[in-house]
Structure formats: C-alpha cells, structure tokens
C-alpha cells in the first residue's frame, strides 16, 4: 500500500513507452531503415518520445536522425499498441505519414536507409511493421485509416 492507502498497480514501473514512427513518402516510394542494433531487420523510421517532447516532434526528429530527411507530417496513420509488438519493451507507437524530398541516408541507429515500393519491400520487417506497411498501402488505395 502506498501513502494514504493507495495501492500500487501490479505493473507499476513497467508502463508502456511511447514511440513515434513516420512512413516517409518520397515520390511514390517510402523510406525504410535497416536497423543497426537488435532486433534486426528493416523498419519504419522512428523511436522513443523524449521527456518534454510532443509525439509529432519526436516523429520528425527521429526521421531526420535516421534518414537525414526533413519531413512534413501529412496524416496520422494509426496507433499500434499490441504488448508483444516490440521484444525489448512494451511500446505504444503513434504512426504518421509524412513527405520529404531527396535521398535518404542511414544515420543514428539506422545502418542504412533506402526507398521501396509496395511490391519490393525488404524482409524481414522488424516489430509489427509489416502490419503497419499493409495498413499504409491500404490507406493510400482507399483513404481508410486502420482503427
């Protein structure tokens, strides 16, 4: 029991960590980064939200750090919260769509950054990013965002 009879929740100290990702459109292709650190694979640029930072600011910052691209956010794609989506931590990710121009360059914790189309996505995609990319391409075709 805490002060005043307050009961500490069983998962206190293990709350979800907020992350922000952005599907970066460059023309008719999207930017993915090859992760430098485990878990391996290709991923949507993104990362953890820092203290005092908005989720939108984190998405733009992470995109710049990992790809060298200055991104303008254009849409909210969705929020992804499956507790098993990241093997390292329980994360809740807010995923945006954004636009940029130029050639991506891997930086920070991205070993490489490249442009891909729907028919030539690399494998494996890390985390739940295959689902997110599927949701993104469906959104582009239909205008419907995932729930």
Task: Go through each PLM region and give its residues.
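Acidic, metal-coordinating catalytic segment for phosphate/diphosphate chemistry
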Residues: 1-21
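Residue-level preference for beta-strand/loop junctions
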Residues: 16, 40, 88-92
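Conserved Nudix-box catalytic region and its N-terminal flanking loop in Nudix hydrolases
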Residues: 26-65
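A short coil-to-beta-strand element that immediately follows conserved catalytic motifs
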Residues: 69-78
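Active-site-adjacent beta-strand/loop module that shapes the phosphate/pyrophosphate-binding cleft
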Residues: 80-104, 135-136, 140
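NUDIX/MutT-family hydrolases
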Residues: 97, 105-138
């Amino acid at each position: 029991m805490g002060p005043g009879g307050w009961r500490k929740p069983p998962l206190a100290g293990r709350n979800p960590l907020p992350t922000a990702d952005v599907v970066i459109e460059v023309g008719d292709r999207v930017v993915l980064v090859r992760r430098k650190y485990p878990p391996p694979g290709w991923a949507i640029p993104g990362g953890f939200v820092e203290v005092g930072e908005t989720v939108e600011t984190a998405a733009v910052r992470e995109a710049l750090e990992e790809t060298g691209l200055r991104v303008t956010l254009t849409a909210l794609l969705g929020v992804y919260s499956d507790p098993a989506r990241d093997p390292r931590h329980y994360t809740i990710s807010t995923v945006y769509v954004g636009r940029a121009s130029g050639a991506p360059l891997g930086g920070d914790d991205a070993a490489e950054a490249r442009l891909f189309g729907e028919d030539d996505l690399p494998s494996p995609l890390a985390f739940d990013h295959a689902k997110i990319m599927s949701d993104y391409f469906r959104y582009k075709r239909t205008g419907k965002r995932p729930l």
